[in-house]
Each structure stands twice: as structure tokens, then as C-alpha cells.
């Protein structure tokens, strides 16, 4: 499905909600519930395949899951490619095209080297990917400035770096910026204002702003990350515990 349709759904204040999937069947459930786009969660995909997150899964396996999803659903798919699996921009673009992906997330922590990329380094990667894909791919630039931030004060301290990176990534051609795991509504609102009118992706977290607040803040896209996978896993675990106790799991 086309990147054009995915791009059109990024409207500040009317956010695209993405309940992240991890295989073809969970993707089907997303579509059956009426959501217009499927997104993958790299952590959930990796866990379903028996790996830890952080590019422990091979690119072949990850892109195989993506291809299975696009074959199973008739809505656009955006793929979480972590930091790129050590692939060149051309290789990454080719693999996404082969999987018929309409979009991708690319994070600025280099998982292969275990370090944060510099602003210029990550902007260059994004520009290279966009040069190869053009408008055929919606690039969501994930910004890791808030990961590990200690409460609202820590998030506020991380805000200038996040804004600097967002502006550089947008200048490099990113279609959307994703300051992952911001829990402070005030800080997230300031981030949205600083990069306006660019689309901003927010994470829907149990201890963060709810859907109504995220909409009010003007974000254009909301990801659940591993949220659905964790819920599914918890339900299965509870059913197994009941069965082990000799009671009905149903």
C-alpha cells in the first residue's frame, strides 16, 4: 500500500493511532478493528521470534515478518527497523521496498555499536534513505533523547537536544519525528510547538498522557509500541496459570 496514503493520515491534532503488531495474525486483528495502518514493534517481533530487542534478530528475519504482514493485510505497513541493522541506506531502502513497506521508524541510537549517533551522522543516514526512496517511503525519525530521563525535570533537561535533533532530521527529509517515551504532557507539548507544523509521533504509555491529552497536544501519530504484545502475553500467562491450577482458562 502506498506511502502517499500513510502520509495523508499524519494530521496534527487528528492523530493516527498505531496499535503495533508483531506478526501477520496480530496485523489482521489491527485491521479488523478498523485501524487504517499497521505498524510493527521491533521488540515485539524480536520476542515472538525468540530474541531480545536491540537488533538481536537478523534483518532477514525481521523483513520476512514485514513481508508476511503486507501479504496478509490491505493497509499500509510501517516497519520498525531499529537503527538499520548495520545495512547501508541503499540496502535498507531496497529491503523495505521488497517488503512493500509504506514507511519505517529509524532510531538515532546505533544498536550495532551501542552508542547514540551524532545529530549530523543520523541526519546524513536519513537523507541517504530519503534520496533512495523519495516519496515512496514515510520516514519516522525516532529521537532517543528522553530514554532514561528521570521524571519531568529529566525530560525538560533533554528537551533542547530533542528539538535540535528533530529540526535536523526534518531538514534531512524525515516526514515525522518521534520523541519516544515522553511522559510529561508539558514537555511533549513544548516539543510539538517547537517543531510545528511538522508531524510528531508520541508513545501511548500507561503512565503518560492519555489519547485525549495526546490529541489536545497536537501530535499527529500515536504508537503503542510493545503495549499490545505485553497485554496479549499477560492474558496468555494468566490463562496458563489458571490451567496449571486446574481451573478453566476460558
Predicted regions and their residues:
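C-terminal alpha-helical cap/extension of soluble enzyme domains
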Residues: 200-250
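Alpha-helix-loop-beta-strand connector modules within alpha/beta enzyme cores
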Residues: 3-4, 51-79, 116-141, 183-209, ...
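Catalytic cores of alpha/beta
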Residues: 26-29, 79, 84-96, 206-220
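Hydrophobic faces of well-ordered beta-strands that scaffold small-molecule active sites
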Residues: 17-23, 38-40, 77-81, 104-106, ...
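N-terminal amphipathic alpha-helix/helix-capping segment at the start of soluble metabolic enzymes
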Residues: 1-20, 24-32, 125-131, 137, ...
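Glycine-enriched alpha-helix->loop->beta-strand junction motifs that scaffold or abut catalytic
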Residues: 34-38, 45, 97-102, 135, ...
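Conserved anion-binding
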Residues: 101-165, 244-250
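Glycine-rich, proline-tolerant flexible connector loops at the mouths of alpha/beta enzymes
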Residues: 37-63, 83, 87, 105-122, ...
